[in-house]
From Swiss-Prot:
Lineage: Viruses, Duplodnaviria, Heunggongvirae, Peploviricota, Herviviricetes
Keyword Transit peptide set for record: no
An annotated GO BP: viral life cycle
Subcellular location: Virion; Host cell membrane; Host endosome membrane; Host Golgi apparatus membrane
Annotated protein name in UniProt: Protein UL20
Similarity field: Belongs to the alphaherpesvirinae UL20 family.
């Protein structure tokens, strides 16, 4: 007769697997509970109102970091952005040279004196701004600060208003536009008139001299308008798009 206390060989493997199955089931239940809790936390966080802190535009323009890429090591963008201001200054100098030639022919030197002084003042202001831009970029800051930008705007508007006023006065007030529009006016006593009222005969090769003040005035005023627009319009664009004033 077999011993009743001996273990049943058929039931032994089944009894051994029961603790493992229970452990696996408990782990799955706990994992499901954790997953459900995480989902509840995510949904609760999504329902909670969040405080949105708006970034101010001036904070975005405080550093020049990452403004250069690997493909831009030679400063191609800097050359492209400085081409038109340099061209504007070059056009002003050429205009002054043409007026100097016209002065030698007609004797009218008020416009060349005033525009040369205006060009010199603008060149000095541009040179000072260039030094400030160079220093700020080397120190990883934006090119212009608030006071430097205000100085640049004041210089552009001041020189521009003076140049526009001078050209309008000399063309319309002193009849120089009349000289340019009517070729026969060069033989009138108004052109190069002396104190006695006699007419001066224009030297040979100066037949186009009466046209120079009008053409130069148009070109110079166009350059002045560009300078003002190039200084002010970017600030207005940032104000319109970002609703903030930013200096850069």
């Amino acid at each position: 007769m077999a011993d009743a206390s001996a273990p049943d060989k058929k039931n032994a493997p089944t009894n051994a697997l029961k603790p493992d199955l229970i452990k696996i089931a408990v782990e799955r239940v706990l994992a499901a509970i954790d997953t459900e809790n995480n989902e509840d936390l995510i949904l609760a966080a999504a329902r909670e109102p969040r405080e949105v802190v708006a970034a101010r535009a001036p904070d975005l323009f405080t550093s020049a970091a990452y403004s250069w890429s690997e493909e831009d090591e030679l400063g191609t963008r800097m050359r492209a952005s400085s081409f038109f201001p340099v061209a504007s200054m070059f056009a002003k100098i050429i205009c002054c040279l043409f007026l100097l030639w016209a002065k030698s022919c007609t004797g009218h030197g008020a416009m060349v004196t005033g525009l040369t002084a205006c060009t010199g003042a603008y060149a000095i202001a541009s040179l000072l701004c260039s030094f400030v831009v160079y220093y700020n970029v080397r120190t990883d800051n934006m090119p212009f600060g608030t006071y430097t930008k205000l100085f640049q705007i004041a210089a552009c508007i001041g020189c521009g208003c003076y140049a526009l006023g001078l050209t309008m006065e000399k063309l319309f007030g002193d009849s120089e536009m009349y000289f340019a529009l009517f070729p026969d006016a060069k033989n009138s006593p108004l052109v190069g008139a002396t104190a006695k009222g006699s007419a001066l005969i224009l030297p040979q090769g100066c037949s186009v001299a009466p046209y120079v003040p009008l053409a130069v005035s148009v070109a110079y005023c166009a350059a002045v308008v560009y300078d003002i627009a190039d200084t002010i319009f970017p600030l207005l664009w940032v104000r319109t798009t970002l609703n903030e004033f930013a200096v850069f």
